[in-house]
Amino acid sequence: MAKVAIVMGSDSDFDKLKGCVTKLKEFDIEVDVNVISAHRTPDEAAEFAKTAEEKGIEVIIAAAGMAAHLGGVLAAHTIVPVIGVPIKSTFDGMDSLLATVQMPPGIPVATVGVDNGTNAAILAAQMLSLKYDYLKQALKASKDKIAEGVRQKNQKIKELVKEL
C-alpha cells in the first residue's frame, strides 16, 4: 500500500487539510499526519525528513502558512518528493505561496494552489501511480466522475437558457 505523510506547521492548518486526508483515503493510500514546525521544532523537521524513506513514506505533503518554509526544510533533508500546500494567513496567502514555490536550485518543492490540499493528494496519487497500478484505475475513475459532473452542469445550464 502506498504511504504519504502530511506535515503541517501548526494544528490550526488541519481544517484546511481535511480534504487532503479524505482524498488520500479515498485512493486507499496510508496517511501519516504530523504537526512539525520548521521554525519552532527545526530539529524534529530535519529528523522527520531524514527518516521518512526508511519509514516507508513515499511522498510528503507539507502545509504551512505565513513564512512557509516547512516544505523547503523537509525537501533539504530527503530525496522523498515534497508537495507544498501554502496555507492562507496574512497577505491572503501570497506570502505562503511565494515562500513555498520559490525554492533554490536543487531543492524542489512541487507546489499546489493556496489551501488546495485536495490537489496535493491527487498529485501524490499521480506520482505513486507509477509504482502502484491500483492508483491508475482510481485516478481515471476520479477524473471520469469530475467530467460527468461538468457534463451534468452543462446540461442544466442549457435547460436554464431555454427557460429564459
Describe the function of each predicted region:
Residues A2-R40:
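Glycine-rich phosphate/diphosphate-binding loop of Rossmann-like nucleotide-binding domains
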Residues S129-L164:
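Glycine-rich phosphate/pyrophosphate-binding loop and the adjoining helix
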Residues A2, I29-D32, K55, I79-V80, ...:
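Glycine/charged-rich beta-loop-alpha catalytic/anionic-binding loops adjacent to active sites
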Residues I36-E54:
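N-terminal beta-loop-helix "entrance" segment that forms/cooperates
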